Amino acid sequence: MTSLQILADANIPRVEDAFGQFGTVRRMPGREMTTSDVAAADVLLVRSVTPVGPALLDGTPLRFVGSATIGTDHVDRDYLRAQGIPFAHAPGSNADSVADYVVAALLGLARRRGGALEERTVGIVGCGNIGGRLARRLSALGMEVLRNDPPRARAADADGTGHGFVPLDTVLGAADVVTLHVPLKASGPDPTHHLVDAAFLDRLGDGAWLLNTSRGAVVDGDALLAARRRGDVAAAVLDVWENEPSPDPALIEAVDLATPHIAGYAYDGKVRGTEMLYEALCDALGGEARWAGTDAIRPASADALRGRAPDPRLSATEWRFELARQAYDPAVDDASLRDLVKLGPDARGEAFAHLRAGYRRRREMQQHTVPGTAVPAEHEQAVTEGLKMKLD
C-alpha cells in the first residue's frame, strides 16, 4: 500500500498510534486548516470546528474524510458523495460521556435546589445514541421519562411497531426537566435550528429545568436570556453555545451551569471516536486493523478509578451526588468558563478554544468501581444503572 499523507485535528487523541500504519500523520488546529493544508493530504480527520465542503476541499486529492464526532452538521456530505470521497464519523462514540454529564448536572441541580430527582419528570428530545442511553439511566434514578423523537416515531409507525414516543407538546406540558439531544438541522421535516425559541420557552411549565448538550444553535440564546431574566425558566444548563468559540457572556452569567462544549469530552469517548475512524479507513483501503482503542483507555492500575461510598446518613440526592462527583463534577468546568466572561470577544474565543484543547483526561463513570459492601441496598440500582459504576 502506498504511504499516505494524513492531516488530523490536533485534538484527536492517539491519532499517530492508530493511523501511523498508513503513512505520515500531520496534526494541526482544526480551526486553522486551509485548502493549501488539505492539498498535501490524502486523508483528512476533523472535529466539529472544521467546516468541510467545497471551500476547503475543491482541487484537493483527498481519498477519505473522517470526523471524530457524533454530529455531521459541519460536513457537506452531498459534496463528498458527488466527489466520490468516502466519509465516516463516530456516532455513539461519546454517548456515555454526554449521559454522564447530564446525570451529574441533574444531581447537582437537585442538591442545590432541594427535592429529589424521583419527584421530577424528564422529557428527552432526541432519542438516538445519547437520548436512548440517558432514558434508561434517568429511569434507573427514579425519574419518569417522556421521549420525543419525531423521525423515529414516524419510522416506527411505518413499520407498525410500538414506540412510546410522545409529541413535543406533551413533553412541554408534562415535563419539569427538558434535555436536548438532537442534530442541528436548518431545514427539512424536522428542523432544529432555534427549536428552543420564545414560543417553546413560553410553553414550558413553571419550575422547569432546561439542558442543552447538542448544538448551540438549537437554542435561541436571546430568547433564553430573556426568559431567564423574567424568571420563566427555573434552571438552565448549557454546554453548547451560539457563536462558539465566543459565547454571549450575558448568557453564561444567566445560566446555572455553563461549560465549554465538553459534555462529550471524556477520554474514553474521544479514543472510541479515533478507533471508529481508524476502522472505517481500514475498510475503505482494505487494510488490516492492527490497533485497538481499548488498550489506550485501560487504567494504569486496578485501583486507579476506585471510588468510595459516601456517608450513608446523607439524603438519597446528596449521597448520589457525592458519589457521581468523584467521577465527574461539572462545577469544575463551569468555573473555568465563567473566568472568560470579562474578556473581549477575540480573547474569549481563544480562551474558549484553549479550554477545549487542554481539557483534562476525564474518564467515563462506567470505568469507575465502588466497593459493593458499602453501597446501601436502596442505592444499588442508581449506582449500577443510573451512574453506570461497577460494584466489586
Swiss-Prot record:
Keyword Cytoplasm in record: yes
Subcellular location: Cytoplasm
Biological process, per Gene Ontology: 'de novo' pyridoxal 5'-phosphate biosynthetic process; pyridoxine biosynthetic process
EC class of the enzyme, as a word: oxidoreductase
Keyword terms: Cytoplasm, NAD, Oxidoreductase, Pyridoxine biosynthesis
Superkingdom as given in the UniProt entry: Bacteria
Catalyzed reaction equations: 4-phospho-D-erythronate + NAD(+) = (R)-3-hydroxy-2-oxo-4-phosphooxybutanoate + NADH + H(+)
GO CC, any one term: cytosol
Active site feature: R215, E244, H261
Any matching Pfam family: 2-Hacid_dh
Keyword Cytoplasm belongs to the record: yes
SUPFAM superfamilies associated with the record: Formate/glycerate dehydrogenase catalytic domain-like, NAD(P)-binding Rossmann-fold domains
CDD domains: ErythrP_dh (cd12158)
Residues binding substrate: S48, T69, Y265
Subunit structure of this chain's protein: Homodimer.
Membership in a protein family: Belongs to the D-isomer specific 2-hydroxyacid dehydrogenase family. PdxB subfamily.
Function: Catalyzes the oxidation of erythronate-4-phosphate to 3-hydroxy-2-oxo-4-phosphonooxybutanoate.
HAMAP family: PdxB
Protein's recorded name: Erythronate-4-phosphate dehydrogenase
The organism's taxonomic lineage, starting at the top: Bacteria, Pseudomonadati, Rhodothermota, Rhodothermia, Rhodothermales
Gene name in the database record: pdxB
